[in-house]
Amino acid sequence: MATSLGSNTYNRQNWEDADFPILCQTCLGENPYIRMTKEKYGKECKICARPFTVFRWCPGVRMRFKKTEVCQTCSKLKNVCQTCLLDLEYGLPIQVRDAGLSFKDDMPKSDVNKEYYTQNMEREISNSDGTRPVGMLGKATSTSDMLLKLARTTPYYKRNRPHICSFWVKGECKRGEECPYRHEKPTDPDDPLADQNIKDRYYGINDPVADKLLKRASTMPRLDPPEDKTITTLYVGGLGDTITETDLRNHFYQFGEIRTITVVQRQQCAFIQFATRQAAEVAAEKSFNKFIVNGRRLNVKWGRSQAARGKEKEKDGTTDSGIKLEPVPGLPGALPPPPAAEEEASANYFNLPPSGPPAVVNIALPPPPGIAPPPPPGFGPHMFHPMGPPPPFMRAPGPIHYPSQDPQRMGAHAGKHSSP
């Protein structure tokens, strides 16, 4: 059997021999000094089934080893990473990118048509400079607002973590902390993200990650202009230490005349005031959730009028200089709302036990006229008899909780200590 590349028995002339892979920053890892192994014609591409050069490396400490999954020709056709198959420009799945650019790339899937299509694309790639994608993607020049909102601007290195240890899930892992796999609870098997296919990811069909991102894009918030037509100022937050006034002016000058740009380095924000309301509305629409400078996504909102900020300061109890006022001592706090009529009638404010009917107090009535008893010596006539002790069959008053409730507290036992 011939094994030379010149033999067309197995179409070896189309086998790939590369010196460096096409990778995204996330798959490459955060360590700039990595050791990468190269295996010439090590595996076949999972899309076109042709042998290609396989690269294998470890992206960082406590990360799993990664390798290239598709050949560079298939990677250039879709402008994706050879490992994760996400778009190199936006970091999104192919299905989301194609939906944002409003085009559908129908690649052949049968063996013969796929090989013929790949050879034609390789010829087109060889005639280009290799910096731009070919095919339908190379003809799409317009950008999408949805892609700018969903784009991942920073690497997500947690994607390189090891897989979950199956022995730990069964309770049989004996490696402990030395186990190279994760000791975590696996995801729900019914979760759509648990079942992913590399071919579905490449062709942009039935991708659960793409479906999740498209649903998020449909429910993404909007920035509505304020009702006050005099507001022409935009707030830009999250500047950091690297973004300057020149960077902001280079972005916002295209929307209209800029009156002033005020950068507050202490709060890491800026205020851009336009000359007209129309320019401010266009800038807010084109920059909301899409303003990225030096790989940093900035937060764009509408500014507030001086009257609205003054009312808010009065409500918060702050002065114009931002000093918080202390509450005046001696003033009562907020009182609870009064109870309803039914609740107030049945409320027990002193936690007293329920008692029966009120005790009857023996009050002597005045005698009929003409039959008044003689007054005691030394006293004038009186109208009421002195109160006597209650009869034994009558109920005593309720329980006593405080000394002031005792009816015999003031000199009731004086007769016991007096001399006979």
UniProtKB/Swiss-Prot annotation:
Residues 303-343, 372-420 are annotated as: Disordered. The keyword Ligase does not apply. Residues 232-305 form the RRM domain. This is Pre-mRNA-splicing factor RBM22. Residues 309-318 have a biased composition (Basic and acidic residues). The lineage of its organism: Eukaryota, Metazoa, Chordata, Craniata, Vertebrata. The modification N6-acetyllysine is found at K212. The modification Phosphoserine is found at S4, S102. SMART domains: RRM, ZnF_C3H1.
